[in-house]
Every structure is written in structure tokens, then in C-alpha cells.
Amino acid sequence: MEGKNTSITFDGREIRLTTGLYAPQANGAVMIECGDTSLLVTATKTNKKEAADFLPLICDYEEKLYAAGRIPGGFMRREGRPPERATLIARLIDRPMRPLFPIWMRDEIQIVASCLSLDERVPADVLAVTGASLATLLGEIPFYGPMAAVRVGLLGDDFILNPSYREIEKGDLDIIVAGSPEGIVMIEAGANQLSEQDTIEAIDFGYEAVTELIKAQENLLKDLGIKQVKPSEPEVDNTLAAYLEKNCTKPIDLVLKKFDQSKEERDLELEKIKLEVHSKIDSLKDDNQLKVLTSENEKLIHSDFKKLTKKLMRSQIINDGKRVDGRDLDEVRKISAKAGILPKRVHGSAVFQRGLTQVLSTTTLGTPSDAQEMDDLNPSTEKTYLHHYNFPPYSVGETRPMRTPGRREIGHGALAERAIIPVLPGKETFPYVLRVVSEVLSSNGSTSMGSVCGSTLSLLDAGVPLKAPVSGTAMGLIKEGKEVRILTDIQGIEDFLGDMDFKVAGTEKGITALQMDMKITGLPVSIISDAIKKARPARLHILEKMQDAIDKPQESLSPHAPRLLSFRIDPELIGTVIGPGGRTIKGITERTNTKIDIEDGGIVTIASHDGAAAEEAQKIIEGLTRKVHEGEIFSGVVTRIIPIGAFVEILPGKEGMVHISQLSEARVERVEDVVRQGDEVTVRVREIDSRGRINLTLRGVAQNGGMSYPEPTPTPVAPLN
């Protein structure tokens, strides 16, 4: 087999593009590789036309564990439902691809990116996005491409292009920038409270690299003799559009200018206008062109009515600087926030409301054993902070079956999770596993940013010592030719009929997360820069309102939350604490009714609903790991008797033996003649043998004094109530 290939090198890493070798029945297929990471990306289009007013595009990302040389767990030893990571990468492909297809296109299109080999130094997600563009172009599918994506990291003061997993973890920025020849079409970012200016510079840096990957795709197409299919809109009968414009422009415009009406009232009035038009058309004669046209396509009235509403709303913003609810372009909706709204059976709770968007967030404190184990190709093996986002149908006044979380819910949850992670306390300071659940009670735009705000409030209510509170807002855009208007805190209709949804989250210090999606074919960095800068005063305004509700962590945890103690032991003594077959640690947990977790680095975490029990377990473990020296004197308790001597517990969990010859200066016939089980005695450490066994003596030791058990100072990481 022979194929065509090209390559481009970034910071010493070569990206290779090869076509013509695999998946010959797909419209387009490309192998994209960097290091040992290899992906096969295919694009397939059917001629089936969907009777819908949207593009039926499906983007899938598949990763099999063989790509990392692993066999799946479970009885079947086969991959099952796609992991969350695969869902997020599938969304990452979809988001920059969708706006680059013609808005009139209704053919079914499916893009499948399959990770065949994974190099832990080279993340596969940005390669999948670039591969999706090239596969679509190779398949000669109408598309406003090429499009490409790169990742930018920040180590110290230096930007890094397509950093490794380790560099991402060590750095202060992880941003993915996707763009077309027209400009940027998608941004996804997490940052460690990065300034707006540094963030903008990173985006600009990333887009420069995107243009190089776009050129590489164009060169490969040229070498193959493939001409890009420029989308050309089919002829459309505009009879209905003209009729609606003539008969509906004035009534729709009046509705959009009723700034004091509610969303429900506006929706009802617009629906009434649409039904009246529908009724008028239905009353026409059967051979009337309008009636024939709408009877052949029942959704045409809805589609053209939406287009007219969109046109009028956008015109009002461009020309009058007013939005449908009467706000100025940079004005935030009314905000209310309250923490601690649920009983303390729920460890932390809060409700955040902005306009008609209302989110209830709850926080649960868990033990280290509650961490989520990751069974995918991500180098991270577990998650200790989880954010789950739920969007029930009643939040938008609808009815539908409630199923498992969909792609949108997973994506919104991941964004809110990413926004909070940079401000979470360290494991040694606060070793709890944290789960936040955000329930959207009402939705009218920017529920993901409402979830960020609700998460902050509920975490503080749970007593989590955040480094700083985080707030978020969604920025919008209306672009008509050269006229551009940036909107602050967009609501549902502005998201639906606008050109951009740009979510910005962060602290007073800087940005922690970004997510930008477009409905047009690209924007210059200058406009994106303006949006980021205008988001800051909105974020700080929201933050001020949140701090009126709760401005610091609760001083005490819920009485129903587990109590944790965390301390460090010598990693070489972990085996001593665990004991043969786990008997020692099992005995401690049963004796104290606690849960104990020990990490490879020697960090011990003890969990219990009883603070005294946790302290007792800590005392035992510290006794087990305390080094005993020859000559030390201890006051201990005789734990058992054997024919040749007695065992004495000199520290919690640590015993030594007094040989029968060391019980007294005189000869002893029977051990029981001197000591019995339960007696308290004072002993001296005579020697520690080569196997670490402690030999004790009573000879020459006064029995009315000596050292008592040491009382180590507990190291609680949360207040013990």
C-alpha cells in the first residue's frame, strides 16, 4: 500500500499526516501521528436528507486500551460504554467542526476518530480535531475549512506548543485553540488564575501555530490533486420568507421591544404570532403557492419565522444597543445567592440565581477511598474532585424521560469542575474527596457558569478552605458585517440567535477556565481579547454578590461529615503498619472503628465519624512507626504470657518480649510468679536484634516510675467536633 503524506514540526515534535492507506470506503480518511500517538480519523457522508432545521452531524472518539498495551478489566475483558474522557474529546471535535459546515446542509455526516496508539507524552485530543478537518476535506464534503487545533501550555514565563501530559500537569495553563482561515472557532482552557493579558497572548500564540497546520493540510490536498469543495447554497424559494417579513416584522419587533415582559410572556406572544400566520396560510386555497410550499415541508414556517426573529433581535442590538430584556450590552442580570439552604445531612449546599437561571449545588465530603478510579487512557489514575451537572426537563418547562447524563451534561460538568480545581486546597491540608452536584432548577442561559458560582458557595458552606472564590459569566456576540457587539451575561435567546457563547470563569486574581463556541466561521484574536477583558468586571460584580452570601469557609464541618486526620510516616515502614496479609491495619480499623488509607509516599489518612477514635488510630500507627532505642524506659502493659517470657506493649501497637531470665534478679521458675496478663510494668529496652525484634528487661528497673506512653500531638486537617 502506498499513500501520500506530509509533516510539520513544532518545538521539535513532528506531526505526520498520511492518507490513502486505510478505510477506503469512508469518504475521507487520514492517519495523524505525533511521537507514538496514532489516530485514524474518518469522515463519511450519506445522501440521506434529514427533515430537520439543524445539521445531523455525529462526532465520535474511540479509544481502546490496546492503544496503551493494556487489557480491559471486568469479566468480559472488553471495552464497554465510552468513558467520560472519550465523550469530552468527541465534543471537542464537534464544536469547531459544526460551524464550518454550511447552515443549509442536512446530509448525515459522521466523523470517527480512533486512537490506535497512545504515547503518554502526546495527548490525542488536538490531533483528533485536526484529523477531522483533513478527513472531511479529503472526502470532498462541503466545508469551510481547513481547520486545525493546537494545545498551549505555560511553564514559568514560556509558552509551550502541544505540551506533554507531564508538562500540562506542572504548568499554569492548558488551553486548546482551534481555528480556520477566518479566525478562531473554538477555545477550551483551564488555568491557574492566569491574568487576562497572559491568556490573550496564549491564544494569539496558539492561533499562529494553527495557521501552520492549515497550510500543511492545503499542501497535502494540492499534492493529491484534490480541490476543496466550496459550499454553494442551493436555490431556495423565498416566497414564505417574503410573506413573513411583510406580515410579521412589525408584531415581532413590538414583542422584542417590550423590555419589561418575562421570558414566558415573550415566548407566548411570539408563538401566538406564528400560529396566526400558520392559520392564515392554512385558510388559503389549496393551489396557492404558499400553501403548497408549507404543506410539502411542515417545518418551513417554524424555520423561516425563527430566521426573521433572529434578524430583528440582532438588528435591535446593533442599531439600538438594547437587548430583549432592556439591559445594556454590558449589564449583568439580577443576582441572588444563599448558602446553607439544606439540613447539614448534606455537608454543604447553596442556591445561585441569575435572572431566570437557577442552580442548586451540593457538596459531599468523602474519604480517600471514595476517589474515582479512572479506567481509560488518561495517565491520571484517580479523581479526588468530582462535579456532576444535571439538567432535568422541568428546568425549561418541558417533559421528557429522564435518562443517564448526555454529552451536554457531561461537558458542562467538566467545565465547572475545571474552573474550581485550581483553588482547591492541597491533599495534605484537606485530604477529603469532594463531590459537587449541580442541579439546574431553571435555565435561561449560562447554567454552566451558574454551576461554577453554586459550586463555590456550597464548598465554602461545607467548610472547604478554598484558596479563592470563583465566579463565571457567559459572553455573547452579534456580528453583522463589520459591526460587532459583545454582550455580557447572555440569556437563552441571545445564545440561540447569537454568534458566540464564550464562558469565562475565574477569581479576582485571574482566569481558571474558558470555553468558547462559535456559530460563524471564525473570529480574530482582537475580538476575543475584547470579550475576555469585558468579562472581568462582570465576574467581579458576581463575585461581590456571592461574598454577600458567604465570604469564608464555615469554621466547623457538618456533624454528619467524616472526620479525617492526615500525617506522614516513613514510607519504608508502611509494611509494618499493614502487617502480614494486612492483619495489623485490619486490627487497628476494627479496634478503633475507622477507615485508614496509606499512600505510597507515606501519607496516612484516617477517617471516622468519631474524632476520638481517629486520634486513637493515629496514636497506634505513630507507635508502630516510632523508632525504639536501646536503653529507653517505657511503662507498658503485659499483653500475653508464654512459657519463656512475657510480651509487653510499650507503645500503641508495638510489643517487646521480656525473657523469663529478665523478669527478676532472682531465678524465676514460672513467668506467672512475677507478672500476669494485664499488669502494668516498667521495662527497659535491652536490645533490638537483627530482625528488628525488641527485647526488654525488668532487671534493675524500678517499678514505681518510668516513662509512660508518649502522647503525640494529633495533626488534624479538619476541626474535630
Curated annotation (Swiss-Prot):
Its UniProt entry gives the catalysed reaction(s) as: RNA(n+1) + phosphate = RNA(n) + a ribonucleoside 5'-diphosphate
Residue ranges of domain S1 motif in the record? 631-699
| Enzyme Commission numbers on file | 2.7.7.8
Q: Name one GO cellular component term.
A: cytosol
Q: Does the keyword Nucleotidyltransferase apply?
A: yes
Provide a GO biological process annotation. Answer: mRNA catabolic process
Gene3D superfamilies referenced in this protein's UniProt entry, alphabetically = GHMP Kinase, N-terminal domain, K Homology domain, type 1, Nucleic acid-binding proteins
**Positions contributing to Mg(2+) binding:** 495, 501
**Keywords assigned:** Cytoplasm, Magnesium, Metal-binding, Nucleotidyltransferase, RNA-binding, Transferase
Q: Which residues form the KH domain?
A: 562-621
- Give the function comment from the record: Involved in mRNA degradation. Catalyzes the phosphorolysis of single-stranded polyribonucleotides processively in the 3'- to 5'-direction.
Family named by the database record: Belongs to the polyribonucleotide nucleotidyltransferase family.
Name of this protein: Polyribonucleotide nucleotidyltransferase
